Amino acid sequence: MPTDCISYQTSGYFSKLIQDYLDQKSELKTLYNHFPTLENFEKQIAEKASNFDNHNRIALVNTLKKQYQNIEISDSTKQNIELLALENTFTITTGHQLNLFSGPLYFLYKIISTINLTKELKSKYPSYNFVPVYWMATEDHDFEEINYFNFKGKKFRWNKESNGPVGRLSTEGLAEFLDIYSLELGSSTNANTLKKLFEDTYLKHDNLADATRFLANSLFANYGLVIIDADDADLKRAFIPYAKEELEKQTSYKAVQETIEQLKEYTVQVNPREINLFYIEDNLRERIIFEEDKYFVNNTKISFSKDQILSELENHPEKFSPNVIMRPLYQEIILPNLCYIGGGGEIAYWLELKSFFDAVNITFPMILVRNSVLLATEKQAKKADQLNLSWKDLFTKQENLVNAITHKISAFPIDLTPQKEILKTQFQYLYELAAQTDKSFSGAVKAQEVKQTKGLENLEKRLLKAQKRNLSDQLQRVIDLQCELFPNNSLQERQSNFSEFYLEKGEQLVPLLLQKLKPLEMNFNIITI
């Protein structure tokens, strides 16, 4: 194949907002702090160092040690946790939901982007330490988003009821799920490794948070990854003043609404609530609403006066859960973080938040679009070569691709533009004639031109359809290849689970990705495995 990457901007899978951000358009410059280049991290380090409350490092390290108590920990991860106590240590963070068996492939790419960036930063700034962090979205309550994964075109769903924060959800019932999934995996060495990984992850851990920590640790512990569950009372102590301001002043709502006004030319990713906090218990996560001088927990009978809710916050900060607007702030309060790495949708909502961070005097992190990858087998790459297709061709929407290939391989031109030009010339003569006679004739000429031009356009469409039928065998091979690489006409990384590729590559998969991906290059990578 002629190239192994294409730009995000030309891939066709990124919004105008993200494309303009990547192009560093001037109208977006007020919405972020520093654009993520290796050189710009020097400024970000200085700003975070002067703004971060280093007392929060103690709670952070103690909490992480507690959370890692019952898990085998690598020397590199153990060292990174200890390093977080030092004032010259900073984090690079990504976050992800607790998707069953990691969910879509981009789970890997997020974490690999994070690990690789810490390596690049250590090389550039050796007097500092950089720790890769995976923030587990344990407080999310939308179980339907995470209770399945796709494997070889089939959806494997865990049917279970859940209302509260998913991190606290029991893993009971996943033994039966594994029985069904195992049948699809087969009995190869790599298949047996995957079965054991699933079993050790979900059948030996009581809740989804512990299970997901084990899974991510199994895949990435050797690279120093630190996994955090922020659904924790000690960590939330540092968040109390900001949650208090949110309850009393609705600062985030006002600031984000102003930013959304700036973004009106784009699709807005997230709209803020007046209060961007939830109230949580084991089986409950509902919005806090302020009405008539009282605070209500939505869909419950729970209510508080102002004094009562502030007392509840002081005594039980773990019962207050930030939503998508407040969670980034919580993250930046408890972590000495320099950069958040996320997908296009995440970066879009981070771009709404800088004015809010400024209002509460917290340094806004750099925001980096994660690595995106298309994994292709050698057989698929060879097939693309035989069909004379570039990777850019394969990223084209299917209808457009089929039309373009039909034009390309047709034995004769399908484009009737020359005939349209001849027609236009003929009618030009008639218009000149019409100018010398009655106006009604000029109208008749115009009507006839429209009719005949439309007729040629219809013939052109019918000719294209006829050639598609005539070339159906060749076109079907193109369609089949694209469908293999883009399941459900979507990006592979949003559809397929890592286990599909682990079956082929086994333990080589993660090291291969770590070796190939460069976090700051911001290209869509095509990797042949």
From Swiss-Prot:
InterPro entries: Bacillithiol_biosynth_BshC, CC_BshC, Rossmann-like_BshC. One of its GO terms (molecular function) is ligase activity. It is an enzyme of class 6 (ligase). Residues 450-485 form a coiled coil. Keywords: Coiled coil, Ligase. The keyword Magnesium does not apply. Its EC number is 6.-.-.-. Belongs to the BshC family. This is Putative cysteine ligase BshC. It comes from Flavobacterium johnsoniae (strain ATCC 17061 / DSM 2064 / JCM 8514 / BCRC 14874 / CCUG 350202 / NBRC 14942 / NCIMB 11054 / UW101).
